[in-house]
């Protein structure tokens, strides 16, 4: 499956992953090439790593690694020692000030078994939210004082006040509750106007939501699910 599409500004390439088959794809438009980087375990997310040359951060099943796209070497940065074998990482994002936020879910997608973790700059790992379903897309507004977070199992996008000094979050409200007929909200990004662009699994498109009103603004259809 194609997940975690991430543009790498310094490297001028697009990365995405096949989670279950452990493949990282690298598309370089200037060369017109697609390279495959294969791993013996699942990969769930890609995070740009500013100032580290050809290295990117990859979320694996139960750890984060720093991977060099050119040398094809990696080193483990942090492990999740608390994870049950039936749990795995899911969508992960870096906040504007550099913390890594990581969703953890049950491999069978059982509701209520998911969690949201924060990895601080000193690589300390802190559980932030429990009893989640399928933690997914995470974004921040331009000011950096609001975090929006998708729980796919509950088909909602929640809004949190965000303290960039401490990394603390405070629940404000459910910004968007996605109707069943629109499918399941999955990965998410935010544009310059503060609108949320959300890929909907089973909804055949990317949906644009206003977090301030909770209303659907636009929909971009696709032929896939």
Q: Residue locations for each model-derived region?
A:
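A short beta-strand motif characteristic of beta-propeller blades
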Residues: 32-38, 75-82, 123-130, 171-178, ...
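Beta-rich, blade/repeat-based domains predominating
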Residues: 1-11, 40-56, 82-99, 128-147, ...
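Hydrophobic alpha-helical segments and helix pairs
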Residues: 72-128
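Conserved beta-strand positions in repeat-built beta-propeller and related beta-rich domains
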Residues: 8-9, 14-20, 56-62, 100-110, ...
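A short loop-to-beta-strand structural motif that recurs across blades of beta-propeller domains
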Residues: 23-25, 63-65, 114-117, 156-158, ...
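Beta-propeller domains
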Residues: 9-39, 61-66
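Flexible "stalk/tail and boundary" regions
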Residues: 54, 69, 117-123, 142, ...
